[in-house]
Regions:
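Alpha-helical structural motif
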Residues: 81, 124, 206-210
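Beta-strand cores of modular interaction/reader domains in eukaryotic scaffold and signaling proteins
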Residues: 6, 51, 143-146, 172, ...
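N-terminal anchoring/stem segment of glycosyltransferases
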Residues: 1-112, 116-119, 123, 131-137
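Extracellular structured ligand-interaction cores
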Residues: 4, 47, 125, 142-144, ...
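Conserved catalytic core of nucleotide-sugar-dependent glycosyltransferases
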Residues: 149-220
Length: 221
């Protein structure tokens, strides 16, 4: 059986292994490269076609876990390629007009102080569309799944191939909290800056065409 869904993911070491409590970081924030790869072993066990973006030094580890399964690894020097965008993010994070809008409890979250963290989180739709535009996706559906999404074995439930007949006319997002009623675009932005999380960013599914539409909306926001 061949899945109708190609999985795309990415991993770059942004130094999260050093974000330990004894260095003043929030509890349980640290996550080393080895921990991320232990999570990826579960996702990487799936026999779906996968396209994985990473740095040159980590490519062999990715390929070893995939162990011959249908895989394309694309290496990127993320610091060099996105140097300008990273500097823009850092400038915003240090701007008082931004920090003054934040609740004090949020200041320890990496969304508000780590430009590298914000950068990689915002490149998901970029990576998917990059793979599509390169002609690497051969399936009707494409899923972005975070590299470290499968923290526990029960996430994949022993599946060898992940396949589901998602509606190709829609983008499929998944919620972790009920009760969201969007009344305006401004409300959505207020929820973003306040870190009110309703939608999982770690798993998104859509057709190739819908991903292109989605990417345009991401760029506009």
């Amino acid at each position: 059986m061949k899945s109708s869904t190609t999985i795309i993911t990415a991993y770059f070491d942004i130094g999260r292994g050093d974000w330990t409590a004894n260095k003043g970081f929030r509890e349980k924030l640290a996550r080393s490269v080895d921990v991320y790869f232990s999570y990826f072993e579960r996702l990487g066990a799936l026999e779906n076609e996968m396209i994985i973006f990473t740095s040159p030094d980590l490519k062999p580890r990715v390929e070893a876990i995939r162990n011959g399964k249908p895989t394309t690894v694309i290496v990127i020097d993320i610091k060099k390629k996105f140097r300008y965008i990273r500097s823009r993010i850092e400038k915003i994070q240090k701007d008082e007009s931004f920090t003054n809008r934040l609740e004090p409890r949020q200041l320890k979250n990496p969304e508000y102080w780590s430009p590298e963290y914000v950068l990689v989180c915002n490149l998901k739709a970029y990576f998917v569309n990059k793979a599509i535009n390169m002609g690497l996706v051969k399936t009707p559906l494409v899923a972005w799944i975070d590299f470290g999404y499968c923290r526990k074995p029960n996430v994949t439930r022993g599946l060898k191939i992940w396949d589901f007949p998602f509606d190709e006319s829609k983008m499929h997002l998944f919620t972790i909290k009920k009760g969201l009623t969007v009344t305006s675009q401004q409300q959505a932005f207020d929820f973003m800056i306040g870190n009110h999380v309703y939608i999982i960013g770690g798993a998104i599914v859509g057709s190739q065409h819908k991903w292109k539409e989605f990417y345009k909306l991401v760029l506009e926001s």
